[in-house]
């Protein structure tokens, strides 16, 4: 964004999220990660965040959100048709063989959907809501299971509908600290008899930051205040400040067996 010098942009941006995902990838010694981005208006922001976070991506793909196009694209990404043909070929080979345990092998093969692995350990999906569920469902259709590959998404704001989707679990995503969020919501509700939206949540800390800076600095050129590396601890979370950028230090969560768990 080309913002004036006296304007600050803050929030849970793509770079903040990828910094957290990068930490998770390192902790789990994940070697090959593919990145799936929908063909939407934030595509360029994602590309920039990948560069800024220096996260290692094996391959990047842009996909269409229209269901039939999406499924075909996921099939191509996962080499589904080749892996499906491998299974058909193996079934035919065993059927025509004289193996002693022929029936047992056939029984096992008929329970499978494909033969052959995919060339990645984890998938990052920069999507949300029903569109996200469609992508993961397409991965399941192509025999890529969250139980065998890490499925990582962007901040889902603790979407409770994901807890009910057993087939797409486990999944992982970065977000703000849930306890801090709940404390803020309760405080806000007591004061205003309503629950806050996410804009008010993020503004809560940012307004405090600007007030603090205004006490000791000239705000005619705000960008000068953010060139040195620094951190600001607010009520909601911690913000890292450096090179005129504000990044939110996030937690990482897992949804598995219909439960939410904080990983770090």
Segments from the language model and where they lie:
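Extracytoplasmic ligand/sensor domains, especially the bilobed periplasmic-binding protein
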Residues: 1-49, 55-60, 160
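Extracellular/periplasmic periplasmic-binding protein-like sensory domains
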Residues: 4-7, 14, 55, 75-84, ...
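Structural motif
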Residues: 17-20, 66-78, 102-109
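Sec-exported extracytoplasmic/periplasmic mature domains
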Residues: 26-30, 51, 55, 140-144, ...
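Short hydrophobic segments within beta-strands
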Residues: 35-37, 125-126, 154
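Short acidic, S/G/P-rich loop/turn micro-motifs used as interaction or catalytic elements
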Residues: 40-43, 129-133
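Segments of small-molecule ligand-sensing domains
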Residues: 193-207, 211-260
């Amino acid at each position: 964004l080309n913002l004036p010098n006296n304007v600050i942009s803050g929030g849970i941006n793509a770079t903040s999220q990828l910094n957290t995902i990068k930490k998770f990838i390192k902790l789990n010694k994940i070697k090959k990660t593919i990145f799936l981005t929908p063909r939407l208006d934030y595509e360029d922001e994602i590309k920039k965040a990948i560069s800024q976070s220096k996260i290692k991506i094996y391959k990047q793909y842009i996909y269409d959100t229209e269901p039939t196009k999406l499924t075909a694209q996921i099939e191509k990404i996962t080499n589904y048709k080749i892996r499906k043909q491998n299974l058909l070929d193996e079934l035919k080979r065993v059927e025509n063989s004289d193996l002693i345990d022929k029936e047992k092998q056939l029984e096992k093969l008929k329970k499978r959907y494909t033969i052959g692995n995919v060339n990645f350990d984890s998938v990052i999906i920069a999507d949300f809501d029903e569109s996200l569920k469609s992508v993961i469902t397409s991965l399941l259709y192509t025999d890529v299971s969250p139980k065998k590959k890490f499925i990582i998404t962007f901040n889902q704001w603790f979407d409770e509908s994901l807890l009910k989707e057993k087939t797409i679990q486990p999944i992982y995503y970065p977000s703000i600290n849930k306890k801090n969020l709940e404390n803020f919501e309760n405080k806000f509700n007591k004061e205003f008899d309503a629950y806050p939206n996410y804009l008010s949540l993020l503004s809560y800390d940012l307004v405090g930051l600007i007030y603090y800076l205004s006490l000791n600095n000239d705000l005619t050129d705000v960008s000068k205040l953010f060139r040195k590396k620094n951190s600001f601890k607010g009520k909601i979370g911690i913000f890292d400040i450096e090179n005129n950028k504000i990044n939110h230090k996030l937690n990482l969560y897992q949804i598995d067996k219909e439960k939410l768990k904080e990983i770090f």
